């Protein structure tokens, strides 16, 4: 962990120690609570070897400034965890503000909502789940982005809410 934090710090990664923690948790499949509670518990050699190799790969990607969320494959948004990859933008706090405003200002559940360039689907899915909107459509020109959105919709049991592909948005 110290080695990972130092490596990221040398690469100029902000919050290097925190990022090293997140990467270690993902690589070894342990969380901080278990790490501290079970410090003296040995890790099986196979798990240690596999985890260490994965940790080194993840550290290298982060040192190359690949976003942490992209390496981990997930980002929390509006209290839900969304899958993300290099084909979509990482959901951000300012986008949560947009969703919160829609939820506050448009309480009618029968509205037809369209999320253009949906990416991960975080806006459309959040509006459907948190707002209870019955007609939410998410579209994107990128098939790769739509795969991510569909994965998120399936995981949150919303695939029937609609994910479509369009060549143009005229």
What is the meaning of each model-derived region?
Residues 1, 20, 55, 65-68, ...:
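A general structural signal for well-ordered alpha-helical segments in protein cores
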Residues 1-41:
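Non-catalytic accessory regions of SAM-dependent methyltransferases
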Residues 15, 90, 143-144:
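Short alpha-helical
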Residues 22, 75, 166-168:
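A general secondary-structure junction signal
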Residues 25-104:
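Conserved AdoMet
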Residues 94-170:
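Conserved SAM/SAH cofactor-binding pocket of Class I
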């Amino acid at each position: 962990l110290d080695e990972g934090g130092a490596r990221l710090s040398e690469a100029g990664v902000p919050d290097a120690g925190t990022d090293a923690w997140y990467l270690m948790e993902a690589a070894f499949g342990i969380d901080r609570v278990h790490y501290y509670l079970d410090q003296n518990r040995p890790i099986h050699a196979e798990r240690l070897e596999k985890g260490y190799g994965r940790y080194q790969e993840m550290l290298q990607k982060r040192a190359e400034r690949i976003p942490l969320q992209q390496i981990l494959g997930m980002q929390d948004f509006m209290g839900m965890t969304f899958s993300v990859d290099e084909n979509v933008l990482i959901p951000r706090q300012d986008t949560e503000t947009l969703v919160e405003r829609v939820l506050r200002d448009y309480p009618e559940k029968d509205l037809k909502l369209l999320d253009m360039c949906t990416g991960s689907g975080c806006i459309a899915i959040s509006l459907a789940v948190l707002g209870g909107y019955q007609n939410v459509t998410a579209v994107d020109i990128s098939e790769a982005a739509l795969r991510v959105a569909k994965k998120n919709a399936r995981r949150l049991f919303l695939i029937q809410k609609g994910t479509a592909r369009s060549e143009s948005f005229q």
